[in-house]
């Protein structure tokens, strides 16, 4: 099996579960979903890091995923090389700091970005 953050090559074993299928088969779809989503997020972050040169990559993925998986998406992005993430829990489990930006809709509500920032 692979260690966390290690590059995957086609046909690599990424997780090995030993035991009767009846003991874990019920969880197979969830395990597959977690592995495929997390590896996809980490791979995307790694691609960004490789192509960014010296520019640090910050993960804002929490804006685009369901809130129940936002911290795992952030954690996966940090595993892939992002230096910060946008959820407090994602930052805690990845031992980084969180950051965020002001919502564009907040600026629209106030009519002007400076007014929204002051609020």
Q: What is each model feature region?
A:
Residues 4-8, 15-119:
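Buried, small/hydrophobic-residue-enriched core segments of structured protein domains
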């Amino acid at each position: 099996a692979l260690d966390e953050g290690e590059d995957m090559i086609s046909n690599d074993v990424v997780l090995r579960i030993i035991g009767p299928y009846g003991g874990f088969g019920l969880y197979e779809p969830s395990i597959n979903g977690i592995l495929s989503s997390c590896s996809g997020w980490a791979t995307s972050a790694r691609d960004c890091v490789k192509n960014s040169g010296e520019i640090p990559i910050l993960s804002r993925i929490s804006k685009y995923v369901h809130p129940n998986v936002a911290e795992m998406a952030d954690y996966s992005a940090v595993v892939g090389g992002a230096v910060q993430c946008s959820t407090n829990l994602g930052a805690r489990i990845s031992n980084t700091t969180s950051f965020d930006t002001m919502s564009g809709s907040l600026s629209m509500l106030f009519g002007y970005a400076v007014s929204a920032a002051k609020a």
